[in-house]
Amino acid sequence: MTKTTTCLYHFVVLNWYIFLNYYIPQIGKDEEKLKEFHDGGRSKYLTLLNLLLQAVFFGVACLDDVLKRVIGRKDIKFITYFRDLLFTTLAFPLSTFVFLVFWSLFHYDRSLVYPKGLDDFFPAWVNHAMHTSIFPFSLAETVLRPHNYPSKKLGLSLLGACNFAYIIRILWRYVQTGNWVYPVFASLSPLGIILFFSASYILSASLYLFGEKINHWKWGATVKPRMKKN
């Protein structure tokens, strides 16, 4: 695929995510039945955090595309480094995690993660925009251009830190309101919740390594860019 086509792809997907980040929080804003959905903002839902993350990543990717054409590759090392770090450690693992976990729980017992009553407010296309298309968009990014992966220690540490921060957010929300962000947690014992969180990190770490394998399979070994020291 040509560089122009890749730039166009980034621009189109960026605008798609900008639209979703604006449109979805507006759904049923004045509906009493969706009061719990809107209380606490988007930061309590991993799905909505992921949509915001994808918008940020594709925004950085677009900026990288434009600057490379305007001022040249050598002058924007930091932007390229940040783009790759964001995609490899967060954007790809998180979008794949949301896709796999949501649909696994949905087909097992949808009431654990997406109660049927939400269908009255969220059309099917919105559900798929939040939980399905995120994966092929990220997968396409892995095959459109190579990404320099950081060391496993750095990559998995950043991923782990973000996992831990979100767990704290979930627990803090529960302490404040007495309600779990996702119904699945209400069906688990304290030990079950600990095991769920542990399994979630193991899965997300595995997806990080999976993304690295895809990158190596498609592009071969890549040289990690070194940041210049002052």
UniProtKB/Swiss-Prot annotation:
It is a multi-pass membrane protein. It is an enzyme of class 3 (hydrolase). Its EC number is 3.1.-.-. The record marks T47, H131 as: Important for catalytic activity. The keyword Cell membrane applies. Keywords: Cell membrane, Hydrolase, Lipid metabolism, Membrane, Transmembrane, Transmembrane helix. Belongs to the AIG1 family. PANTHER family: ANDROGEN-DEPENDENT TFPI-REGULATING PROTEIN (PTHR10989:SF17), ANDROGEN-INDUCED PROTEIN 1-RELATED (PTHR10989). This is Androgen-dependent TFPI-regulating protein. It comes from Rattus norvegicus.
